[in-house]
Amino acid sequence: MNILFVHQNCPGQYKHLAPALAARKGWDVRFLTRPGKPDVAGVTKAEYDLAREPGKQTHRYLTNLESAVLYGQAAAQAAEKMRQSGFVPDVIVGHAGWGETMYLKDVFPTARLLGYFEFYYRAYGSDVDFELDRKVTLDDRARIRTKNAAQFISLEAADWGVTPTLWQKAQLPREFHGKVSVIHEGFDTDIVKPLADAKVTLPSGVKLTKDDEVVTYVARNLEPYRGFPIFMQVAEEICRRRPNAHILIVGADGVSYGRSLPDGQTYREKALSEVEIDPARVHFLGRQPYEQYLTVLQISAVHVYLTYPFVLSWSMLEAMGCECLIVGSDTPPVREVIRDGENGLLVDFYDHLAIADRVDEVLDHDDRMAEIRKRARRTIERSYSLDKCLRDQIRMVENLAEGRRPGNVAVVPPAGQKAVGKSGTQRKKRGAGRTRAPAAAKRRG
């Protein structure tokens, strides 16, 4: 069996799947990627590079499409060299987000294509119209529709698609739902687990354990899409209410999604100019090595996870795997996993006082939260463990290699989950919910 993986940032979502297939006797597994990416055990790596960047005069609606065409062209040219050398894949497995999969079936017409579809953009019911007071214009709608062009081409070309959550599937055009399965990549629950004697020593020398009031927040970058400005208002309130609480913030100062601030200002700098916190108890840890990051989760008394309707962060699932008590935003990606009061707590994304109230609820009644923590862990073991997810991924590749299609194979959603539509996005008008107390009143409190 010949398998070709394609991802510009090897191994990407295929960290476990590629070596698992390569370990099979008689399977020839190749990986097509950009130069300088890591090797994968048992996998033969091939590289491509872009001929150029999108042109400066390109219409801004078309910048993403031109970039995708350049990626697709480069990947196809590299694939053609592989074909000329005698390698013809039975199955191609590739991420559709950058355009690499658009033309691969033109090189290998007999191959079956399994596409990974991470996020299909929508003007409404998703991230764009979630921002308070943002008016979605005709320009926005046209730009977003065009932004999906490369994914649409890849969707049409794919024999089978996969996406990690039901909500992400719901964003895809309905006519393609029949050939898209929902399978998460999963992670190792023997590593991501609670640890009773976990301890974090901060740069200041302060040592924290599970016995302390530790509130955690994690994001790749500290930015609005992951609720960072809201969380800083929560941090201010926690500092005022709870003199013994420590707040650990993991994440860098860049922008992964959305817009950057003018003049190079970071969202952390902006937030610190707007709130009053105790710097001795609010700790910015930056990005952490994976083991240290897990230790932060393992000592957490409350983990706050906020997100726009967008791709669900692994950090929330890993926090649940560590038996963290999640206080999460009541937005569709979070609701798909967390049921309020059962395996976590949900709250209005924009209501910082309600979020602080739920943090108080957990810290004041930790004895009542033990079963919620355990159910959070069980949710992960049942639906997101690497053992289960990798087994499902391998079965999907095998089915595709044997000529089956999603319509011929029963795909069971993760346990306890229900289909999530595009509606129901939580978005409130400014002024809805409670307002912040005046600073002077808070200081008197």
Residue ranges and their predicted role:
Residues 52-62, 110-149, 190-199, 252-262, ...:
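Acceptor-binding helix/loop patch of EC 2.4 sugar-transfer enzymes
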Residues 203-226, 232-237, 247-248:
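Conserved donor-binding/catalytic core segment of Leloir-type glycosyltransferases
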Residues 308:
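Aromatic "clamp/platform" in nucleotide-sugar-dependent glycosyltransferases that forms part
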Residues 325-328:
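Short hydrophobic beta-strand element within catalytic cores of glycosyltransferases
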Residues 340-341, 345-352, 361-366:
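Conserved acidic donor-binding segment of nucleotide-sugar-dependent glycosyltransferases
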Residues 354, 361, 368-383, 389-395:
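A short, well-ordered alpha-helix in the C-terminal region of glycosyltransferases
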